[in-house]
Amino acid sequence: TTIATVHDALSHNVNERVDFDDVFSSVLRMAAVVASPTGQVSTVLEGSFGVVDADTAQALATVLAELVTNAVEHGLDGRDGRVTVKACRDEDRLEVHVMDDGAGLAPDTLMTGLGTRIVTTLVRGELRGVIDWEPLSGGGTDVVIHARLHQRAARAEA
């Protein structure tokens, strides 16, 4: 599970910080496989998350696993496709895009499901950020997260 993956990474590190790129590569593969029992889904990670603290790692892994799962289950809806996660890190700022090449959002789609509410709460609370769902011009959806990382994690990068 996502939580077990983060805990495993933290167990090898006494300072409670973890290279999230290593953690997330496992989470990304697991989420896509579990969500897509029928279609072939390729997953791509672009950019780098860098080192984050334990609390950030747990919240970020949970949010991203949910977003990748939703992209596969709802965006791709059983067909073959691609989910790309792009991370852009600048000291204590993190921008993440979770993009799929699926059907995209209908113009009147309300993002009110339980998973969406949990993700939004984690992004606003734990990650001190904002999240938006945007349609991609060629089809698909781009979920964009802007987060502020804890200073301790940002200093670990320096």
Feature-to-residue mapping (PLM):
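Short beta-to-alpha transition helix within the HATPase_c
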Residues: 1-5, 9, 16-34
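Conserved short strand/loop->alpha-helix "switch" segment adjacent to the catalytic nucleotide/phosphoryl-transfer site
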Residues: 18, 33-68, 72-82
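A short coil/beta-turn micro-motif at the C-terminal edge
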Residues: 89-91, 136-139, 149-151
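Glycine-rich nucleotide-binding loop
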Residues: 82, 104, 136-144
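C-terminal end segment of the histidine kinase catalytic
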Residues: 145-158
